[in-house]
Amino acid sequence: MYSLIRKCLFSMDAETAHNFSIQALKLAGKLPINVLPMPLNPVEVMGLQFKNPIGLAAGADKNGEAIDGFGKLGFGFIEVGTVTPVAQDGNPKPRQFRILEAEGIINRNGFNNLGVDVLVENVKKAKYDGIIGINIGKNAVTPIERALDDYQICLRKVYEHADYITVNISSPNTKNLRTLQYGEALDDLLRSLKSEQESLSQKFNRYKPLVLKIAPDLTDEEIASVADSLVRYKIDGVIAGNTTLSRDPVVGLKNAEQQGGLSGKPLNTLSTRLISTLAKELNGALPIIGSGGIHSVASGQEKIDAGASLLQVYSAMIYQGPALIQNLAKHIQVR
């Protein structure tokens, strides 16, 4: 079945196909039908009860338009966003490119979204009964020195409506954003956001976990430094990781020269290395959500065995369809 749908989608450019899929899932979410069952493979992470350990990675549903549709594919959790304080168009099109031979995708979207207020309204309307994470970022026009302002605005607005909040400082498509992963800049950001989280938990009488999303391009030394900051500021979880700037796995393939972050199957080895190194540094202090390159039960299990407690998928679903989600959710064994 999906082979026919894929043929139709792949006759379009990547972004048009994505937008078409979002609208189709938005419609499916409104219909009184179950597309696919929710596989039960429960796990508790960050004090939250997940029906299964397979989540939708941020970037798929930036505005939270199709939460119920994605929920009907069997995801145990859904992360929407990345969202910014105000709407922005992102980078010029075309900005999404398939690398067919490698089952990869390059994007340089640049946090295109309708703004945090629109996303919050969509989340409030959703009937999906799994865990919902909201991924927050900064507007492109905001100087990097003022990035904290944008993260605080978003955190305050989404806190009441999210089960957990992810702070995205690792997209390669927003100028200078990745500099927030290092040293004093990271410490200042985490210190301030942790303080804000504590204030909001008192205001709403409910503690919502705060998660950091990092890049797979960090060196071992940089990973150790990030891990130290995560522990010191009592951050609740970490997503490892985002897209990569490396082109080593796709050298010579069509579209490999395009600028942006590479995701999909070619990212698998790099993301597993990130998880493994991070797990050694954290030594169980906080959970890791594995993301990047998961394309089979074996590749997903490899990330669990490397130290991840949950997994997120997006690019591989474009190539393989929702059956992948069902297989992962049923067969992944969390340690």
From Swiss-Prot:
- EC number of the protein: 1.3.5.2
Subcellular location(s) per record: Cell membrane
- Please list the GO terms describing molecular function: dihydroorotate dehydrogenase (quinone) activity
Give the GO terms filed under biological process for this record: 'de novo' pyrimidine nucleobase biosynthetic process; 'de novo' UMP biosynthetic process
Active site, UniProt feature: 171
- Cofactor detail note: Binds 1 FMN per subunit.
One Pfam annotation, family name? Answer: DHO_dh
- CDD domains noted in UniProt: DHOD_2_like
Q: Which cysteines are joined by disulfide bonds?
A: none
The gene from which this protein is expressed is pyrD
Assigned keywords, A-Z: Cell membrane, Flavoprotein, FMN, Membrane, Oxidoreductase, Pyrimidine biosynthesis
> Which residues of the sequence carry a binding annotation for FMN?
58-62, 82, 135, 168, 213, 241, 264, 293, 314-315
Q: What does this protein do?
A: Catalyzes the conversion of dihydroorotate to orotate with quinone as electron acceptor.
Reaction catalysed by this chain? (S)-dihydroorotate + a quinone = orotate + a quinol
Q: How does it assemble?
A: Monomer.
Concerning its family, UniProt says: Belongs to the dihydroorotate dehydrogenase family. Type 2 subfamily.
Q: Which InterPro entries match?
A: Aldolase_TIM, DHO_dehydrogenase, Dihydroorotate_DH_1_2, Dihydroorotate_DH_2, Dihydroorotate_DH_cat, Dihydroorotate_DH_CS
Where is it found, in Gene Ontology cellular component terms? cytoplasm; plasma membrane
Which sites bind substrate? Answer: 62, 107-111, 168, 173, 242-243
Q: Write the protein's name.
A: Dihydroorotate dehydrogenase (quinone)
